[in-house]
Amino acid sequence: MKNLAYSLIVAASGAFLAAGVAEKALHRRALRAIPIRVMVNGTRGKTSVTRLVAAALREAGLRTWAKTTGTQAAWILPDGSEQEYRKKRPVNIREQIPFVRRAARDGADAIVVECMALHPENQRMMAEEFVRPTVEIITNARVDHISEI
């Protein structure tokens, strides 16, 4: 009985590991399909800058998706319309994955993502794993948030 339980634990662990590796590979492929990836960071004004940059890229003829966070959490679609995406779920930096996949599947030329991470480790993960920006914008760095940027 112990061997069966041990075997089940090992098999389940292997399955979870394989799923994680596959998810990372699929996410990286989706990121590579989007040539321009902008991440907006800072202490104030991130949502406004995200919206402005996305509008400018759309105006330049690029198929652009954008994602804002906070009180105005929305996906901004290539036609400029908005789609609420969180709907009472807790905030999580992993929410970049479905956004990037959908934008890539739609043939996006660019994405503009408002950085939602507060802690340094999550900021690193946003940049290095979830967005891999080709352009980073820092709106400002005020003293009340300086340790988090």
State the predicted function of each range.
Residues 43-45, 70:
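Short polar catalytic/cofactor-binding loops
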Residues 1-41, 48-60:
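Short, basic phosphate-binding NTP loop
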Residues 45-46, 92:
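Charged, low-complexity surface patches
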Residues 28-35, 56-149:
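ATP-dependent carboxylate-amine ligase catalytic core
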